[in-house]
Amino acid sequence: MTKFLLPLLALICFGVNAQVQKEIFESFKLQERRGVSYYFPEDYTEDKKYPLILVLDADYLFDLVVANAKFYSEHNRMPQAVVVGIHQSENDIRWEDCDYEQTTGLPTEKAKLFYEFLGTELIPYLETNYNIAPFKMFIGYDITANFGNYFLFKDTSLFNSYLTISPVLATEMESRVPSRLLDLDQEIFYNLILEKEKTDGRQQILQMDNAIKSITKDNIHYFFDQYDEPDHISIAAYGISKAFDNVFKLFRPISPKEYKEKILKSEEPVFKYLEDKYARIEDLLGFEKAVELNDVMAIYAGSAKKEDYESLKELAKLCKKFYPETMMGFYFEGEYLELLGEPKKAMKAFEKAYQMEEIDFLTKDLAIEKIDALKADFGY
């Protein structure tokens, strides 16, 4: 039994630049060795924080989740994330790990231990040894999808987001999940994926869906997607990308539609939209996101179109912080001062911009044009 006294030390160390690694984790709670797969972004760094995606049924789902996470992060549609998968196919142990009492719907004794393994051993180990952000996502399928719901019943949910794929719901879960979501004050994303094929538990799932849909709290974000083609097996391959879209929509760069409908039509200062967007990202994910060039240009265009000069001033300050080597900050400052009727100060700002790196449409030639125009107009 002594081999279980230091369960975490049995996790073999590896370089995080190795993108995917499977290791054996010795669990004190389970008194078992469990196969765990890890994915770290190729450019993982101690300077950033990464959301954690926990995947049960890793033998089937881990590669699918990693592929989607890589694709979405590479196209800037979600942050880079650490993905951890628990292997449960050997001896069909997934049913033991996630089983529940038929009469009460509560986890069996073995399932309680598995719950403790995840919540008090594996995740704390990752949080201690790697730069894990506060935002955590749970992904499960069938019986393992139902198991994720038990994490909702803590005073504070361990996970901020749940992807529940065609769940085998425990007794009374169709009422317990909506009731718990209604009571929670923290922000929760709950994605339910279902096939249209008739299954034994389909009506129970639809009852839960209807109950959750009736919740009108701002902190609960519920998404239900039902697919025509897949059956109960193939449904596991559906919905992961849709769930990432639902959860990380805010993380995406400002789109042309967003620009037209939310920035140009808003009565508030243009810069406030950018400020609120990035503050919301930080609140949700637990880390500051560097402001995207696309978003800078959207706010610049909106400020010009709406003649919102104060937003241009704030944008200049922001660019000096996030793009300090480029000419953006001083160029935008120069335009602001020019519009404010401060030609001497504007010219100095453009001169500083000229000495810095070009970016996007901002070139040294453009800065010279501004300087020459001011000299011609005011005789400097």
Tell me the role of every PLM-derived stretch.
Residues 170-231:
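The feature captures the conserved acid-bearing segment of alpha/beta-hydrolase catalytic domains
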Residues 301, 335-338, 369, 373:
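Residue-level recognition of tetratricopeptide repeat
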Residues 130-142, 162:
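Alpha/beta-hydrolase fold nucleophile elbow
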Residues 16-51:
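A domain-start/cap signature at the N-terminus of enzymes
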Residues 156, 323-324, 358:
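Short coil turns that delineate tetratricopeptide repeat
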Residues 52-117, 121, 125, 129:
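Serine-hydrolase catalytic machinery in alpha/beta-hydrolase-like enzymes
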Residues 217-280, 285-286:
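C-terminal catalytic histidine-bearing segment of alpha/beta-hydrolase fold enzymes
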